[in-house]
Amino acid sequence: AEDGIRDVLGSRGLGDVYTRQVISEKLPKYVNADVSELQILTPSRKSSVGVDRLNTVMQEYLNPPDSGKMEKKVGDTIFREGDKVMQIKNDYQLEWEKKNRYGIAVEQGSGVFNGDTGIIDDINNYNQSVTVKFEDGRYVDYEFTQLDELELAYAITVHKAQGSEYPAVIIPMYQGPRMLMNRNILYTAVTRARKCVCMIGDERIFNQMAENVSETRRYSSLDERIKEIKNIE
């Protein structure tokens, strides 16, 4: 992170009204970015603050059901127009196109890759297809039978975020599997942010992760970054 506030919000949870305001209004304004450009990062998939649970909670808050928005349910997941989604496997055959401001295709190609993120632009029940607009401007049409290649991406694992950067990241600080609650995971999450890191939850969990060096030390600057976050001289 280059310049930004780092905020440990006491014992607040992601369902807290103030926390929701931070995610939907304060952070986007602070980093001059759309809320869809922010990213919640969590160590695990299966826990009270794992990816699956957080995506359900944040979808309900940031993109709730609306009579004007089409939906498609796949297994336990509801995909809704306006949802943030991620491609979860490499698919070299998926065709894409980029459009000009008049909606006319000006560039075409194929290949969508693991980790690509975008927003659901359209769900067409008649054609049984979902159109996703990816961050780089590509439009991709998925048949309903291909939706197992997508998942909601309001929250993703820290591992999945490696190699990516975001204007701001939100990191829930709650107890999880000890093997995942370590300094390396914390470092990876913190350094995904270009401007701002917001930590929500229990400050003691932050301390536990900072002190858990069970994995090989790989980052010489981590101590300095942790002190910066904690405002320690």
Stretches found by the model and what they are:
Residues 1, 67-69, 180:
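Short gly/ser/thr-rich secondary-structure transition/capping motifs
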Residues 1-14, 18:
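Single conserved hydrophobic/aromatic residue that forms the stacking wall/gate
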Residues 2-5, 25-28, 157, 184-186:
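A generic local structural motif
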Residues 5-6, 74, 107, 156:
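A structural connector/turn signal
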Residues 11-12, 16, 47-48, 72, ...:
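Hydrophobic alpha-helical scaffolding
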Residues 11-12, 80-83, 164, 203-205:
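Conserved helicase motor core of SF1/SF2 NTP-dependent helicases
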Residues 19-127, 233:
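Accessory interdomain/linker segments of ATP-dependent helicases and helicase-like nucleic-acid enzymes
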Residues 107-110, 114-233:
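C-terminal accessory regions
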